[in-house]
Amino acid sequence: AKQLVYGLERLIEVAGEMTIPVLVPPWNRIAPAFIPLLPGHGYAGLSTYGHRRTDRPTEGLLQVNCHVDPIDWRNERKFMGAGRALDALIDHLKCRRLGKVDADEPTGLLTHHAIWTDEAFKFIIQLLSETRQHPAVQWLRAQDVFGLRV
């Protein structure tokens, strides 16, 4: 817990008012016992990977996850290719539409990997440019997703 407090304090020190008090834990995983501690240490949001069970895992904390990871971790640990990444995105959107997952949770796309390649970057740029004009698509900023002002 001390590292979480230090991390948020350091972000505030460096980024000031631009800091969004949302924890994205290493490897997008967190021990359930830590979750109730987060609001007391200044965190207003949590983002992990996969479908959330609830939007409020503890009082004072909003959880909004990512659902599409374009990196193939099981095989070559690199960009899985546009086809497979789009299949994952479409699968999540289908699950939302069919009510298999929380339809109120925005679809999250992981883009923070240290092993990012030009091919992955080009995919993200193309995805953004081709979807941003579609009437059913709205790209959101983290502060808007978590209802925080920056």
Model regions and ranges:
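Well-ordered, non-membrane alpha-helical segments in soluble/globular domains
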Residues: L4-V5, A82-K94, F121-E130
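Active-site-adjacent pocket scaffolds in enzyme catalytic domains
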Residues: P21-A103
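C-terminal domain-boundary segment and adjacent tail
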Residues: G45-L46, G50, V101-V150
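Short, surface-exposed connector motifs at secondary-structure boundaries
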Residues: E13-P21
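The substrate-binding groove and active-site-proximal loops of carbohydrate-active enzymes
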Residues: A1, P21, R77-M80, H112-T117
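Divalent metal-coordination and catalytic microenvironments
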Residues: G7, L23, L109
